[in-house]
């Protein structure tokens, strides 16, 4: 496990997921990628600086997200870990596309219920990520997380295409 993806929208459960990812990364000397999706009213990437000023709320939202990502990055780097941060417009890439592109070995995400926080970020929910991810996924909910884990459930349908988790 050398590359961990942590999608976040900076909620409490996503913060718990980030903390767990840092603990796992320390254990396995892994790199962490923190990923945040943001909804913008226009195609922000193609917008020039002068036109950006027409959207002060979006500028504020992007600035806040960048500051939160920097804080997560600092937390990981203070533990001696390599870390990268990514921020995309909602339509730019899906979480699973990002994970595939960067060949993540693991995804750790927060969830606040059956819909999950990721639905608010990218239009997909945690269940979709768990079902469609090609790598193991840990979903952090409201309960207290005690690491290291005492037990882990590995779910499989035992079909031929199932591969080793690690």
Summary of predicted features, one role per range:
Residues 53-67:
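A short acidic, glycine-rich active-site loop
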Residues 108-111, 136-142:
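Short beta-strand elements of ligand-binding domains
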Residues 1, 104-105, 135, 149:
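Local beta-strand N-terminus motif with an aromatic residue
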